[in-house]
């Protein structure tokens, strides 16, 4: 049983490294304007995470559009705004499919 646990930990670490490599490639290709290739890298990364039954890393999860799956580069194919109407939050708009993602900002309690 202990051997299986070590194997799973090692394979999850390898999967994290591969996801990181794929997302860096997706970022590079998206900056060059090859959005179809960057979408393929994003799909491959998601498949690896699902296969290993691990959550997608948070720093990459927010850089992917949930609707169309494109890699978001702020200012190029997405728009980022801060709003503070009802509750303070960041609004990320994908300019390819016009979907909106809201991320709440945690405020300090006094």
UniProtKB/Swiss-Prot annotation:
GO terms for biological process: tRNA 5'-leader removal. Zn(2+) binds at residues 65, 68, 94, 97. One of its GO terms (molecular function) is ribonuclease P activity. GO terms for cellular component: cytoplasm; ribonuclease P complex. Its EC number is 3.1.26.5. It is found in: Cytoplasm. InterPro entries: RNP4, Rpr2/Snm1/Rpp21. Its cofactor is Zn(2+). Binds 1 zinc ion per subunit. The keyword Hydrolase applies. Keywords: Cytoplasm, Endonuclease, Hydrolase, Metal-binding, Nuclease, tRNA processing, Zinc. Belongs to the eukaryotic/archaeal RNase P protein component 4 family. PANTHER family: RIBONUCLEASE P PROTEIN SUBUNIT P21 (PTHR14742:SF0), RIBONUCLEASE P SUBUNIT P21 (PTHR14742). Consists of a catalytic RNA component and at least 4-5 protein subunits. Part of ribonuclease P, a protein complex that generates mature tRNA molecules by cleaving their 5'-ends. This is Ribonuclease P protein component 4. It comes from Methanococcus maripaludis (strain C7 / ATCC BAA-1331).
